[in-house]
């Protein structure tokens, strides 16, 4: 169908507003992978795109076969009349009438019968008044995104299967996971899996645990599965679905010089195994140098500080080289298995089954493992060997003698407010057995929490106490404080009055005078204050009294003098503005009040 066969009014009439809006936000399910230009070798193109996307044509064009737009779409997609095949992302800046558009041309898929990606004229009838360069090509092979209505979809249907076309179409998180997977496989000499792309793991079903991670994908709502869909769990490519009970699998040793950083938030309502063992490869670590790591008899009851403690005290013989991300909620079923226990450092466990995730008040379980080449000697100066006792720098001094200056924060507190005493060396170095698993785990968790967070707070508090001024002056009697204040200048007294109410009361009650005070001690000034500001001298007065000349005079033995609030030379000095008063009897030549006093004398 050529352009001349279209009706004239179709060239100028825009599409109805009730069909779809051009500036609608993208749905949450379409945020992972941008649409790309598919291979349109055939002339028929079933349109699977949702009708509410911002770059899709009206729904009537793809559904009604009797419409005029349907043949236009099919013929344009086949490349007969030069449809724009650019995969463009555009940004409409608000406030502009012409809608300035920024174009980002994405990857152009190859095809024998595809038209060139040059800028060509589009069809008025296909997309009506939509901008031509903003169009995207149809996607016949791309299935609509799963909205959470299906359960048990195989991962091979949703995960990428071809490495040539889909590797560059992954999201950023999936690309990073794919690179990490290939690097880990190269280091560990693993055989490459059949599917090079990582399998996306989503757990959003309300029910029992999944049967396997590599054979089942469960997608739920956008808010619950958006984070889990952004990362990959590559161990499911190699491992079979784990069964219930204890599973320990020997794997190749990790590469040297890598430290696992594991942050763990476990559910408080995790069930305990009947035999007291960990599920899914969570076996205890022999000769663990830190007491917080789970033993063969401990259950996954560890808090977030347990795996954080593994970060600050690593070991050279047990450093994993894989990258894993797991987002799941703790399994509440009483089936005797604990999902994703604390990972021992010697053998990375098998991937735990994805239990049902509840976004409500039941809590969730997050286990993030990141690898990085870090020397073990960085943390606490350890050499990374086994059976190392956890110690902190402390000086043992008798409580009778005062603490040495500058070393207050190194001392071990003896009072009840101090930290608890560290357990003996054998408790810190041995692995808790099945018989004393509960008590040892609780004690070690408390000690881990104190070691990780409380030690830092304690040292910081001691440093603050060391650097803060001592409050000895508040304990001194008042007559001693008055004697001390009498040796201070006006600035120091003013600062004390502004900072401490107790000092202010003492200065005003006892009339403490500064050493550089310029208040006149003559009683005439108290009886005859400044006529302009009505300021009288009071006890401990450090308030402002600006230069206010007084025309009143007083006959002194050395001549007639005039009452001045401040000396003329000190009027503009900062001291006068801060309350350094100069109320002296001065000669007429030294003050500005001489002329005014002469005029008042003639009256």
From Swiss-Prot:
List of residues that carry Phosphothreonine: 347
Annotated F-box domain residues: 470-522
InterPro entries per the UniProt record, alphabetical: F-box-like_dom_sf, F-box_dom, FBXO34/46
TM spans (from-to): none
The protein's name: F-box only protein 46
Annotated positions of the Phosphoserine modification: 21, 67
Pathway annotation from the record: Protein modification; protein ubiquitination
Function text: Substrate-recognition component of the SCF(FBXO46) protein ligase complex, which mediates the ubiquitination and degradation of target proteins. In absence of stress, the SCF(FBXO46) complex catalyzes ubiquitination and degradation of MTOR-phosphorylated FBXO31.
Bias-annotated ranges (Pro residues): 347-356
Species this protein is from: Rattus norvegicus (Rat)
Keyword Endoplasmic reticulum found: no
Keyword Ubl conjugation appears in the UniProt entry: yes
Assembly information from the UniProt record: Part of a SCF (SKP1-cullin-F-box) protein ligase complex SCF(FBXO46) composed of CUL1, SKP1, RBX1 and FBXO46.
Post-translational modification remark: Phosphorylated by ATM in response to DNA damage, promoting ubiquitination and degradation by the SCF(FBXO31) complex. ATM-phosphorylated FBXO46 is ubiquitinated and degradaded by the SCF(FBXO31) complex in response to DNA damage.
Region (Disordered): 20-54, 111-163, 235-301, 332-359, 396-442
């Amino acid at each position: 169908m050529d352009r001349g066969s279209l009706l004239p009014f179709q060239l100028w009439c825009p599409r109805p507003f009730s069909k779809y809006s051009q500036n609608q936000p993208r749905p949450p399910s379409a945020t992972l992978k941008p649409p790309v230009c598919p291979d349109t070798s055939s002339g028929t193109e079933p349109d699977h795109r949702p009708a509410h996307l911002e770059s899709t044509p009206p729904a009537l064009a793809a559904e009604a076969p009797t419409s005029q737009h349907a043949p236009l779409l099919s013929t344009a997609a086949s490349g007969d009349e030069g449809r724009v095949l650019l995969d463009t992302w555009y940004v409409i800046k608000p406030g502009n009438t012409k809608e300035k558009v920024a174009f980002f041309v994405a990857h152009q898929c190859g095809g024998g019968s595809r038209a060139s990606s040059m800028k060509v004229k589009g069809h008025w009838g296909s997309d009506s008044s939509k901008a031509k360069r903003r169009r995207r090509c149809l996607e016949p092979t791309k299935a609509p995104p799963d909205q959470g209505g299906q359960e048990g979809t195989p991962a091979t249907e949703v995960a990428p299967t071809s490495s040539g076309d889909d590797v560059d179409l992954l999201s950023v998180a999936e690309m990073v996971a794919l690179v990490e997977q290939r690097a880990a496989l190269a280091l560990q000499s693993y055989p490459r899996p059949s599917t090079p792309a990582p399998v996306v793991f989503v757990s959003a079903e309300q029910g029992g645990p999944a049967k396997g991670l590599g054979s089942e994908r469960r997608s739920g709502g956008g808010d619950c599965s958006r984070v889990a869909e952004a990362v990959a769990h590559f161990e499911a490519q190699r491992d079979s679905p784990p069964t219930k009970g204890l599973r320990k699998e020997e794997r190749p040793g990790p590469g040297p010089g890598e430290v696992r950083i594991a942050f763990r938030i476990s559910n408080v309502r995790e069930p305990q195994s009947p035999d007291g063992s960990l599920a899914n490869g969570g076996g205890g670590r022999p000769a663990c140098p830190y007491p917080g790591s789970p033993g063969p008899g401990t259950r996954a009851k560890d808090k977030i500080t347990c795996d954080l403690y593994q970060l600050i005290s690593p070991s050279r013989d047990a450093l994993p080289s894989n990258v894993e991300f797991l987002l799941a909620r703790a399994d509440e079923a009483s089936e005797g298995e604990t999902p994703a226990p604390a990972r021992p450092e010697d053998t990375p466990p098998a991937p735990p089954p994805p239990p049902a995730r509840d976004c409500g008040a039941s809590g969730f379980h997050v286990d993030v493992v990141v690898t990085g080449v870090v020397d073990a000697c960085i943390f606490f100066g350890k050499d990374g060997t086994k059976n190392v006792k956890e110690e902190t720098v402390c000086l043992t001094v008798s409580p009778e003698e005062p603490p040495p200056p500058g070393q207050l924060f190194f001392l071990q507190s003896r009072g009840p407010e101090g930290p608890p005493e560290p357990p003996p060396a054998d408790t810190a170095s041995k692995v808790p057995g099945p018989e004393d698993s509960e008590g040892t785990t609780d004690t070690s968790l408390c000690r881990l929490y104190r070691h990780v967070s409380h030690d830092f707070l304690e040292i910081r508090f001691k440093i603050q106490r060391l650097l803060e001024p001592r409050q000895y002056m508040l304990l001194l009697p008042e007559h001693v404080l008055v004697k001390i204040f009498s040796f201070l200048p006006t600035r120091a007294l003013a600062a004390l009055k502004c900072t401490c109410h107790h000092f202010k009361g003492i200065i005003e009650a006892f009339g403490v005078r500064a050493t550089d005070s310029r208040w006149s001690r003559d009683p005439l000034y108290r009886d005859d204050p400044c006529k302009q500001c009505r300021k009288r001298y009071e006890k401990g007065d450090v308030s402002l009294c600006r230069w206010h000349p007084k025309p009143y005079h007083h006959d002194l033995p050395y001549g007639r003098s005039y009452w001045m609030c401040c000396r003329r030379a000190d009027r503009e000095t900062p001291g006068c503005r801060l309350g350094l008063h100069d109320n002296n009897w001065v000669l007429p030549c030294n003050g500005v009040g001489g002329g005014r006093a002469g005029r008042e004398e003639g009256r």
